[in-house]
């Protein structure tokens, strides 16, 4: 009888953060593709675009003028998804038609005044300032809201509506679905194992190495064993850290370096500005000790085979179970094979 080989045979991998299984089909990786293709952005963007709503000194669609900022710039989203003064929804006991009020705020963070430079093209010093801004915003909003979601949608393929490099910060009066699930499952693991799930996971990955993409003094980026997206990564501190606000100065500056190395490898993989959605998850601000939590960032990039061919989460993925072709180990190997110095900086 043929012996099972995870490189050749379909199998399922369990994601302990979500409680869901992922179908891995490595034998499909060589199938021909005649479907839709993305059009990668080839144009060279200017350092300042007079028509951009996010550039320094420009007027936004609301008529508000941006200051002549020189570092990061944060403002309340002109089209915020959440409002702080939402009235209470009427109480409902209908099990099929439940509703509750959602309060919060939505902010935009411009990473720098340079319209042309995404995260991997910024200096480590500039990236350190971005991390510091994430910390400050999280600390401020965490005084009012239990959940603060820092995230970035990079590229038109991920629905980004403005090419000026920026991220967003949403704060919620509730624990969103993904956060609630991670909170519950990490708490269950902690009760059973007497240690934080992702602290244990970092040690396993450090010992294994096959899924490692970037390692610095304080940080580790891996294609997680249970990755759903082709080149998905999980960025974690090596030490136990509950929230981004708890980082030491050394961890913060080293995180900037890790972010530059990781995002540079992404861009270098297909020699393009690699699209992704990324965001931070940390312990909620709920007044509890939350020792089961470990700070981490998820990177979800859609590209699969090239700068023009992406992964679609449709059909079986929507109706049954998430499926991927490349194994996590194969994806990590491909990311390790490219330089962590951005191709535009290296002159390639």
UniProtKB/Swiss-Prot annotation:
> Top-down, what is the taxonomic lineage of the species of origin?
Bacteria, Pseudomonadati, Pseudomonadota, Gammaproteobacteria, Enterobacterales
Q: What is this protein called?
A: Galactose-1-phosphate uridylyltransferase
The cofactors it requires, by name, are:
Zn(2+)
What is the primary gene name for this protein?
Answer: galT
Subunit structure comment from the entry: Homodimer.
So what does mutating residue 182 to A actually do? Decreases enzyme activity by about 50%. Abolishes iron binding, but has no effect on zinc binding
Q: Which residues bind UDP-alpha-D-glucose?
A: 28-31, 61, 77-78, 153, 159-161, 168, 311-312, 316-317, 323
What biological process terms from GO does the record include? galactose catabolic process via UDP-galactose, Leloir pathway
Under the heading InterPro entries, the entry gives:
GalP_UDPtransf1, GalP_UDPtransf1_His-AS, GalP_Utransf_C, GalP_Utransf_N, HIT-like_sf
Signal peptide per UniProt: none
Origin species, per record, is Escherichia coli (strain K12)
The listed outcome for residue 55 to S is: Decreases enzyme activity 600-fold
Instruction: Report the cofactor remark.
Output: Binds 1 zinc ion per subunit. Zinc binding seems to play a structural role.
Cystine bridges: none
Protein family according to the UniProt entry = Belongs to the galactose-1-phosphate uridylyltransferase type 1 family.
Output a single Gene Ontology CC term carried by this record: cytoplasm
Q: What UniProt keywords are attached to this protein's entry?
A: Carbohydrate metabolism, Galactose metabolism, Iron, Metal-binding, Nucleotidyltransferase, Transferase, Zinc
Which pathway does it operate in? Carbohydrate metabolism; galactose metabolism
Q: Which residues bind Fe cation?
A: 182, 281, 296, 298
The record's EC number reads: 2.7.7.12
**Which top-rank group of organisms is this from?**
Bacteria
Q: Which reaction does it catalyse?
A: alpha-D-galactose 1-phosphate + UDP-alpha-D-glucose = alpha-D-glucose 1-phosphate + UDP-alpha-D-galactose
Q: Which NCBIfam families match?
A: galT_1, PRK11720.1
MF terms in GO? ferrous iron binding; galactokinase activity; UDP-glucose:hexose-1-phosphate uridylyltransferase activity; zinc ion binding
């Amino acid at each position: 009888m043929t012996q099972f080989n995870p490189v050749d045979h379909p199998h399922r991998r369990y994601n302990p953060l979500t409680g869901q299984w992922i179908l891995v089909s490595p034998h499909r990786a060589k199938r021909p593709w005649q479907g839709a293709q993305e059009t990668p952005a080839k144009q060279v963007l200017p350092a300042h675009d007079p028509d951009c709503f996010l550039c320094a000194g420009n007027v936004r669609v609301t008529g508000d003028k941006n200051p002549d900022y020189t570092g990061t710039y944060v403002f309340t989203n002109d089209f915020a998804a959440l409002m702080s003064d939402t009235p209470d929804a009427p109480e409902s006991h209908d099990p099929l038609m439940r509703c509750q009020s959602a309060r919060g705020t939505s902010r935009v963070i411009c990473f720098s005044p340079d319209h042309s430079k995404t995260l991997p093209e910024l200096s480590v010093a500039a990236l350190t300032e971005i991390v510091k801004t994430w910390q400050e915003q999280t600390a401020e909003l965490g005084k009012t809201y239990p959940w603060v979601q820092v995230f970035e949608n990079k590229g038109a393929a991920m629905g980004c509506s403005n090419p000026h490099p920026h991220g967003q910060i949403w704060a919620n009066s509730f624990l969103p679905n993904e956060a609630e699930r991670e909170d519950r499952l990490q708490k269950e693991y902690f009760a059973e194992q007497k240690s934080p799930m992702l602290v244990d996971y970092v040690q396993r990955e450090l010992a294994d190495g096959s899924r490692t993409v970037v390692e610095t003094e304080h940080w580790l980026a891996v294609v997680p064993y249970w990755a759903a997206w082709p080149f998905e990564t999980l960025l974690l501190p090596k030490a136990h850290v509950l929230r981004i606000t708890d980082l030491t100065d050394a961890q913060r500056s080293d995180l900037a370096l890790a972010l530059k190395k990781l995002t540079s490898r992404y861009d270098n993989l297909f020699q393009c500005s690699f699209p992704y959605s990324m965001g931070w998850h940390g312990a909620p601000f709920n007044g509890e000790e939350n020792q089961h939590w470990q700070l981490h960032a998820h990177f979800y990039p859609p590209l699969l085979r090239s700068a023009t061919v992406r992964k679609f989460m449709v059909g079986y993925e929507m109706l049954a179970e998430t499926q991927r072709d490349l194994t996590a180990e194969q994806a990590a190997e491909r990311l390790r094979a490219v330089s962590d110095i951005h191709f535009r900086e290296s002159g390639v």
